[in-house]
A protein has these predicted regions:
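Enzymes that bind and transform nitrogen-containing heteroaromatic metabolites
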Residues: 1-162
Length: 162
């Protein structure tokens, strides 16, 4: 199963200048728990923003830079090869974790979307594709209010392809 996991504002912004637009500790914990032990596929810019491989996961980085390498990751040149490497692990689920270009490439291949919907309109330069309800079914939604650790209200949503 191919899944995309993302935190996106109501206008689908996910980042600006290769940085997240918010700090939501519960979302970071949710991301870790959901992806733990699974292969994660990301673009080079996303990896560079993380600055190191995600522990407890098989990290696969897509880049067009032929000579690029980093310790602790598998480097590939395209999404198809990344998916092949991830499938070879025999894990039950493969996670695409960003960034914007990789999400666009993987969106039509995805079976499931894990979306942390940040309930705010925030300016960004990187966006997640729109989720159309004629193609996707919302199967779970859990709402959380803003609090002292979370500047924005947010929801954990799970969508499955119809």
């Amino acid at each position: 199963m191919i899944s995309l996991i993302v935190a996106a504002s109501t206008n689908n912004a996910i980042g600006k200048n290769n940085q997240l637009l918010w700090h939501l500790p519960n979302d970071l914990r949710y991301f870790k728990n959901t992806t733990w032990g699974m292969p994660v596929i990301m673009g080079r810019k996303t990896f560079e923003a993380l600055n190191k491989p995600l522990p407890g996961r098989i990290n696969i980085v897509i880049t067009r830079q032929a000579d690029w390498e980093a310790a602790g990751v598998t480097v590939v040149s395209n999404l198809e090869t990344a998916l092949e490497k991830a499938k070879a692990t025999n894990c039950r689920e493969i996670f695409v974790i960003g960034g914007g270009e990789i999400y666009k490439q993987a969106f039509e291949r995805a079976d499931k979307l894990y979306v942390t919907r940040v309930h705010a309109t925030i300016g960004g330069d990187t966006f997640f594709p729109a989720i159309h309800e004629d193609k996707w079914r919302l199967v779970s939604n859990e709402d959380f209010a803003a609090d002292e650790k979370h500047a924005y209200a947010y929801s954990f949503q799970t969508w499955e392809r119809k």
